[in-house]
Curated annotation (Swiss-Prot):
Region (Disordered): 1-93
Compositional bias annotation for Low complexity: 9-25, 47-64
Lineage: Eukaryota, Metazoa, Chordata, Craniata, Vertebrata
Name under which the protein is recorded: Putative uncharacterized protein FLJ35723
Organism, scientific name: Homo sapiens (Human)
């Protein structure tokens, strides 16, 4: 079975024991800043070009600090960056706050597009029970005192069951008390 890596490259590494040689290795030295020039003997045979390149590098490091970055100009008239919305997001508002009933027809108006329920493209907010639609925003509304979790549970219950309150045929209606 041929290998994609040539054998010679693997063999050239040697065994793990041969990697740690018995010879003392040279001590590691920290890297020096380009302005600290190494001795000319360690540069290269072409001393003038190496010295010139080091001089160029050191002049770069000692030159003036870079110009501060300027913000990009926005193509639109809106300000750059994110700003907080001025009003609440309708997705987080309770149904009783976000729905408006037209007093003449008792139709529900979408809080996003202000269209009637039947022509609204935002179907996520539309409740599925006529009981929730009637009397929205009035003191007798049973949904006014509910938390968003309770409202979500009630909405899920409306969506998954034709009966309200939710009664599953396989679950007992009264749970036995736990005895310890």
């Amino acid at each position: 079975m041929p290998s994609s890596v040539p054998k010679t490259s693997i063999e050239s590494l040697g065994s793990p024991s041969s990697l740690s040689s018995s010879q003392a290795s040279e001590p590691l030295c920290p890297l020096k800043h380009p302005s600290h020039r190494p001795p000319a003997s360690t540069l290269s045979p072409n001393l003038t070009s190496s010295t010139e390149s080091l001089g160029y590098l050191s002049s770069l490091s000692s030159s003036q600090p870079p110009e501060p970055l300027r913000p990009l100009e926005c193509p639109s008239h809106k300000p750059c960056g994110r700003s907080l919305p001025r009003r609440r997001n309708p997705g987080w508002v309770s149904w009783s706050d976000s729905m408006q009933a037209d007093s003449e027809t008792d139709a529900i108006i979408c809080p996003m597009c202000k269209a009637p329920e039947r022509s609204c493209p935002h179907t996520w907010w539309v409740p599925s029970s006529p009981r929730v639609i009637r009397g929205v925003g009035r003191c007798s509304d049973p949904n006014l005192g509910l938390s968003w979790r309770q409202e979500a549970a009630r909405a899920w219950c409306h969506c998954t069951s034709s009966q309200y309150p939710f009664k599953h045929p396989n679950l007992p209606t009264h749970l036995p008390k736990a005895s310890f």
